[in-house]
């Protein structure tokens, strides 16, 4: 079942070029507003898309739930403009498509600054609910590099311990590192105690990482690999979100090395173009340990996310 006319399977180069016009057509400020951040998850989240009234519409629902939990992303523009009447017609047509598929309509993971755009187009129609678990953490690149200030003192101590204790080599990831990278990823996963939902999410993440490795040479994709004694022990992969912001999609490190997480984060930031000033390190998904780790790095701000359901 697909809610919209097209899926993310068998996408042509023309399709990707069209999508990029929309993903790059407005500063959405969310980590999911790139082609790759959707494409690499297509095996876990069944994605469908269609251009309606000039806006790019996309639905996403877990494949193992038969898309019954599907939501619609905010309609995307390629010219930086949102016309209230066209946007209203777009959403109304999309609601009809959800209804025809037997799926309750909702707009999900809506960046906070875009809620007003939808409400202006359709006043009184939707109820907006803040979803804390989906809020994204945005950091200053220079702070992640320097770890300066009292609030980051413990992180800086961990980094300094690593630098005093170990010799390492940092270099961009390449496809021929795939075997070592996947072995490290699987090894880290084995040591975690997780509930069944987390296990499923990590299985999906593993598949997404495999997909991402095929795109390391794509423009605006950035990566770093950390080698200790010739062995790959940490890596990070991300991409550009906007002129001054990048998103880090994946970060893995062997926890046996104190300070390695701080190091790989620093090296990833140092590998970014100079004009990148902000790093979106995505959401914590409501996982307590992940939330604690992200909060401990003292984000510059949170990119809030909302769920919008029709009233009544």
Label each region the model flagged.
Residues 2-55:
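Amide-forming acyltransferase catalytic core, primarily the GNAT-like/NAT-type
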Residues 34-113, 227-257:
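Conserved donor-binding loop and adjoining core beta-sheet/short helix segment
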Residues 93-119, 124-140, 144-145:
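A basic- and aromatic-enriched beta-loop-alpha substructure that forms the phosphate/nucleotide-
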Residues 106, 171, 278-281:
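Short catalytic-loop micro-motif centered on adjacent basic/acidic residues
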Residues 114-128, 157, 286-302:
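Conserved active-site alpha-helix within GNAT-family acetyltransferase domains
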Residues 123-200:
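Acyltransferase donor/substrate-recognition loop-hinge adjacent to the catalytic core
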Residues 176, 180-231:
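Short, conserved active-site entrance elements at the starts or edges of catalytic domains
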Residues 221-311:
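Aromatic (often tryptophan-rich) hydrophobic motifs at membrane interfaces
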């Amino acid at each position: 079942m697909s809610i919209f006319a097209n899926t993310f399977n068998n996408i042509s180069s023309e399709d990707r070029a069209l999508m990029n016009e929309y993903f790059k057509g407005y500063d959405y400020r969310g980590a999911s507003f790139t082609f790759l951040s959707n494409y690499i998850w297509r095996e876990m989240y069944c994605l469908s898309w269609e251009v309606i009234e000039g806006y790019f519409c996309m639905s996403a629902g877990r494949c193992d739930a038969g898309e019954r939990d599907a939501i619609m992303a905010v309609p995307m523009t390629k010219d930086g403009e949102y016309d209230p009447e066209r946007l209203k017609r777009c959403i109304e047509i999309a609601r009809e498509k959800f209804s025809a598929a037997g799926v309750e309509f909702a707009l999900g993971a809506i960046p906070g600054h875009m809620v007003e755009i939808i409400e202006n187009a359709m006043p009184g129609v939707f109820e907006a609910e803040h979803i804390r678990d989906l809020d994204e953490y945005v950091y200053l690149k220079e702070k992640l590099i320097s770890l300066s200030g009292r609030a980051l003192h413990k992180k800086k101590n961990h980094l300094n311990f690593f630098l005093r204790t170990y010799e390492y080599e940092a270099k961009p990831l390449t496809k021929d590192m795939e075997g070592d990278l996947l072995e490290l990823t699987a090894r880290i996963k084995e040591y975690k105690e997780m509930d069944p939902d987390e296990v499923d999410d990590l299985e999906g993440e593993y598949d997404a990482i495999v997909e991402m490795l095929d795109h390391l040479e794509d423009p605006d994709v950035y990566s770093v690999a950390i080698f200790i004694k010739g062995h790959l022990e940490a890596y990070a992969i991300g991409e550009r979100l906007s002129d001054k912001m990048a998103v880090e999609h994946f970060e893995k490190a062997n926890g046996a090395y104190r300070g390695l997480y701080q190091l790989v984060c620093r090296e990833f930031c140092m590998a970014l173009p100079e004009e990148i000033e902000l790093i979106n390190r995505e959401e914590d998904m409501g996982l307590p340990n992940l939330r604690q780790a992200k909060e401990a790095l003292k984000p510059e701000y949170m990119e809030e996310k909302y769920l919008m359901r029709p009233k009544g």
